[in-house]
Amino acid sequence: MENETGSELNQTQLQPRAVVALEYQVVTILLVLIICGLGIVGNIMVVLVVMRTKHMRTPTNCYLVSLAVADLMVLVAAGLPNITDSIYGSWVYGYVGCLCITYLQYLGINASSCSITAFTIERYIAICHPIKAQFLCTFSRAKKIIIFVWAFTSIYCMLWFFLLDLNISTYKDAIVVSCGYKISRNYYSPIYLMDFGVFYVVPMILATVLYGFIARILFLNPIPSDPKENSNMWKNDSTHQNKNLNSKTSNRYFNSTVSSRKQVTKMLAVVVILFALLWMPYRTLVVVNSFLSSPFQENWFLLFCRICIYLNSAINPVIYNLMSQKFRAAFRKLCNCKQKPVEKPANYSVALSYSVIKESDRFSTELDDVTVTDTYLSATKVSFDDTCLASEITFNQS
């Protein structure tokens, strides 16, 4: 990603080529192999978990799959070529590889930023505008938004096809080929600055504002309920005999909904914060170098910037596993490590099904499965207010 300037290359150097320290090569190869290897496995697991587990197919998880694919692209296109560059000290993938690999690098980077922005907006609508969420926070709409995100970033990143070329430096003892720019820094620096603004500054400002609104609703005020459900509770006279039971159960699952939404929001906020922190060194370096006559390219600092980028793309599956019970259980099931549940008498599982006004669309929240005891089983169906839509809980004996 630290492409060199064409004006600085394609020239003959009389002095011998600078030798990269052996410890730098070893550290680079080991760190990149470990981080990228674990990140590739983790992100593939995220995609498989959501695709193979029906209850995991929620709008939020749909955006997380898009983020996982983008992170995979960054790890493969940016991380692995760094290993060959450390080993050979020269670009070995040719002209086509220069174009395609650089294109995939920026496509993954920009798509990950857009995916984070998309799920931030989705969380804001779902929590702060629950009525609108019935129509906006749906799985099919999430898929359409993701298609638009990838189409937009794919077209935008085609710009790099016209800026790149192979640059050759002839030294006294070697010929070094690098994937760099065919134009001077005066022309590509504005592109870097535009990239910095559109895919870093704007998403982070937007995320800060929206998560502020979300925190105010979740942690300072009760979650607003659906007015339709409130009116229906007064209209249904036949349910008055179970009013006390329904009230207790509704409160129980309302609290579960609030707790679950807080946990999911915390998890997504951690993803956004780490994205901002881990991308800051590289983004800052690019901006600073855009104003320097001679760019700062100290090897160890460049390695630090690259490792931060790879960590950002590799760490998200770890966050999901640590902060989401549903992801943790799904990961265990995918790895065939799930232990047999211990049978407990008089415990029942709760199957949550949510109906939306559009029957062809299914919308599900991130509420984790919970268990209830016989105290709450006298009523077959219990209604409670979900923050996004009307909901119904059906109890099935496990």
UniProtKB/Swiss-Prot annotation:
What InterPro entries does its record include? GPCR_Rhodpsn, GPCR_Rhodpsn_7TM, TRH_rcpt_1
- Keywords from the named record: Cell membrane, Disulfide bond, G-protein coupled receptor, Glycoprotein, Membrane, Receptor, Transducer, Transmembrane, Transmembrane helix
Q: Which residues lie on this side of the membrane: Extracellular?
A: 1-28, 84-99, 169-193, 289-296
Q: Does the keyword Transmembrane helix apply?
A: yes
What residues are glycosylation sites in this protein?
A: 3, 10
Where found, per UniProt? Cell membrane
Topology within the bilayer: Multi-pass membrane protein
Q: Which residues lie on this side of the membrane: Cytoplasmic?
A: 52-61, 122-144, 216-266, 320-398
SUPFAM superfamilies per the UniProt record, alphabetical = Family A G protein-coupled receptor-like (SSF81321)
Question: Its principal location?
Answer: membrane
Return the GO cellular component terms, semicolon-separated.
plasma membrane
Where do transmembrane segments lie in this chain? 29-51, 62-83, 100-121, 145-168, 194-215, 267-288, 297-319
The record's disulfide annotation reads: 98-179
Q: Name one GO molecular function term.
A: thyrotropin-releasing hormone receptor activity
Give any single GO term for biological process.
phospholipase C-activating G protein-coupled receptor signaling pathway
According to the record, the signal peptide region is: none
Q: What is the documented function of this protein? A: Receptor for thyrotropin-releasing hormone (TRH). Upon ligand binding, this G-protein-coupled receptor triggers activation of the phosphatidylinositol (IP3)-calcium-protein kinase C (PKC) pathway.
Q: Which family does it belong to?
A: Belongs to the G-protein coupled receptor 1 family.
Q: What protein is this chain from?
A: Thyrotropin-releasing hormone receptor
- Organism field: Bos taurus
